[in-house]
Amino acid sequence: VRLFYFLILLVVSLPTAYAAQVAIIIDDIGYRQSDIAALSLPSNITLSVLPYTPLGKDIASKAHGEGYEIMLHLPMQALNGKKMGPGGLSNDMNEQEVKQKVSQALIDIPYAKGANNHMGSLLTQLNEPMYWVMESLKQHQAYFVDSVTTRYTKAGSAADSLGVPLLRRQLFLDNDTTHQGLEKQFKKLIEMAHQKGEVVAIAHPYPETIRFLKSNLPRLQAQGIKLVPTSRLLPISLAKKEGASPTARLK
C-alpha cells in the first residue's frame, strides 16, 4: 500500500518536461566472479540477482552500497524443462510453497526492490501460481518486471488484480553478443525510446555485453535519452494505466 501511494505521489509531481527514459536490467548475476564487472557500468543500471548463488548476496550488497538498484531474478519453470537452479518455482507447488519460496528468495538477496522472472515460459502462463507470486511481492512491497519469456504470460493480469506495480521487458539487448548483434539491438533501443518515451531492456553480464555498454551508453545522453533505475519507470506505467497522460518528459 505504501509503495502504491509513493508511486501516486511521483506521478502527480512529475515535472513538466521529461526526456525519453530507458531502464537496462542486467540479469543472471550471482554465479561467476566476472559478474562483478557489471559494477563498472553506470549506477543507473539495475542488477537482477539470482538467489542462493555463490556471489549473489555479496554482489547485491556491494552494488547497493555503490548506488545500484537491486532486483531478485526469480527462477521459474520453463517449457523446455531447463534446470531452474535453487529457489525455482514450479507448477507442482501449492500456494504455501510458492509464497514461501518468493519470500525466502527476497530475504536472500538484500536490498531487492523488485523481481523479474528467470526463464518461466511455463509458469508465467499459469494464473494461479502467478497470483500467488504477486501476493507475496505485494506483502514485501516489491514491484515486478515481466521478462516476457512467453506471449501467453499472465503476470500482468495477476499484478493488476492486486495492485502490484509492473513493467514489461520490451527488448533483449544481447541474444547475439557479436558487435554487430549488440549494435543492432542498441540502435533499436534508441529508436524505441524515441517512439515510446520509455523502454525496459534486459541484458546479461557477458564480457562482450559489458564492454559494449561501457563504450556505448554515452550515446543515450547524446540522443536525449536518460538511463534510469527500473523503478523510475513505474510512475509513468501507472499513470498510463490510470488514464493519465503526462504531457512532457523528465529531464
Stretches found by the model and what they are:
Residues 3-15:
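Sec-dependent N-terminal signal peptides
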Residues 4, 18-251:
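Catalytic-site microenvironment of enzymes
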